[in-house]
Amino acid sequence: MDDCKGGYLLTKYLINMGHQHIVGVFKADDHQGRERHKGYVMALQEAGYQYDPDMVVWFHTEDRQTKPVTSVVQMIKDQRKMDAVVCYNDQIAFSIIGGLHQIGVSIPEDLSITGYDNSMLAHQHPLSLTTIAHPQEKLGEMAGQLLLEKIQGGSDKDMKTEYLIEPKLVIGNSCKNRNQE
């Protein structure tokens, strides 16, 4: 999966919707998180926005339950200028939405938010999340093809081919069009 492009697509979507102060929440201890951050930065820079490391929340596996929520909530309490949040995944997005709801922040009226993974979670709430889909059929097809090649005598060296799958933006109702304000 091209996670860099996924992070780019989400951030670019928010920019196109008129957002100018976009917080990024990314996982520091895995490749996907770093690639999604890279895409976020690329979209900001392409739009002429200054990258601000203070607008990025980095978390690790061991603090994923608390740090993303407490950090974004604290940014709101500190009156940090922000109008959108790009999240590492759907689960983190909904955790942050819960924390923001507790302090009276309404999604998407007050703040837009995106996820990543297009998980079942993204569609089980009244708020459907704008997210990135993993093309499951394509992944299954590629896995099957690799398995067939292996069964038919393909060498392990031949199997080390890297495939980059294109991410797909799934539009929900978690983002407000700020161009209409």
Q: Where are the predicted features?
A:
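Bacterial carbohydrate/catabolite-sensing allosteric modules
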Residues: 1-181
